[in-house]
Amino acid sequence: MYSFNDTLGYHAPLDVNNLPDDKTAITIENLDLHYGQSQALYDISMRIPKGRVTAFIGPSGCGKSTLLRCINRMNDLVEGCKVTGSVKLYGSNVYDPSVDVATLRRRVGMVFQRPNPFPKSIYENVVYGLRLQGVKNSRTLDDAVERSLRSAALWDEVKDRLHENAFGLSGGQQQRLVIARAVAIEPEVLLLDEPTSALDPISTLTIEELINDLKTQYTVVIVTHNMQQAARVSDYTAFIHMGKLIEYSDADTIFTSPMKKQTEDYITGRYG
C-alpha cells in the first residue's frame, strides 16, 4: 500500500486521523454549516496533509463542495450561511474575525467545474491576480506567465499566441489556463471543484496528469463525482454522505478495504 511522489520517492501513507502538525496544511474541527434553517454539514473534523492530493467523494448533494468552499470561505457569498467550528490553515483559523478574506483567497486558490477564463488575452488572464496585487514590472509578469503556464502544462501550446483571446482555446486548454491563473499568485493550497466535469476524456486525462504534478508544489484538494478519478489522482480520500464525514483514509484503503459499510456500499455502487 504505497504511493509514488516524483520528488520524495516511495512513501508509506500517512495516518490522516493522527496527522502531526508539521505535516498538516488544513485542520477542520467540529465544523457545522447551515444555510438558513437547513444544516448542510455536521460536526466535521479532519486534517488534510500538505503536499498531497486529497479527494472528497460522495453522492450529489452530500456536502462535499460545501466543505471545500469552507476552506477559502466561498460560502460567505451565500446569503444565510452560518459556520461554527474552525478551519485552520497552517494553524490559523480562517474564520477569525481579523482574517482578510481577499488575502485568504490568494493563499487558497480555486478552480471551478466549468472553465471560466476572463474575456482577455491568455497573457492577461494569467497576470490578472498579480496586477491586482500591484505588480507592474514587465519582466516579473513575463516570468510569472511562463512559470504558471508551464506549471499548467500549457506553455508549449500557447507560447506563440499569448496575446490572443483566451476564448479561442479549447475547453481543456481553458481549464488549464484557469489553473495557471490560480497558481500565478503562488497559493499554498489549490482547491479543485470537479475540474473535469465539463471536459472530454482526453482533456480529463491531461488535467489528471497535471494534478499529480501540482502536488509537488501545492497542497491540492479536489471534489469529484468520479470515483475512478479519485482513485487515480488522490493520495487520501474522504467519503461524505448527507453532510457527515463517514470515512477518511489513504486512497488505497478507501477503494480496496474501507472500514465502514456505508463507504463500501458507495464504492461498490450499491447506492449513490
Swiss-Prot record:
Listed EC numbers: 7.3.2.1
Catalytically driven reaction(s): phosphate(out) + ATP + H2O = ADP + 2 phosphate(in) + H(+)
CDD domains xrefs: ABC_PstB_phosphate_transporter (cd03260)
Tagged with keyword Magnesium: no
Residues annotated as domain ABC transporter: 26-267
Enzyme class: translocase
GO molecular function, one term: ATP hydrolysis activity
Residues that coordinate or bind ATP: G58, P59, S60, G61, C62, G63, K64, S65
Membrane topology: Peripheral membrane protein
UniProt KW keywords: ATP-binding, Cell inner membrane, Cell membrane, Membrane, Nucleotide-binding, Phosphate transport, Translocase, Transport
Subunit details: The complex is composed of two ATP-binding proteins (PstB), two transmembrane proteins (PstC and PstA) and a solute-binding protein (PstS).
Name under which the protein is recorded: Phosphate import ATP-binding protein PstB 1
UniProt source species: Vibrio vulnificus (strain YJ016)
Name of the encoding gene: pstB1
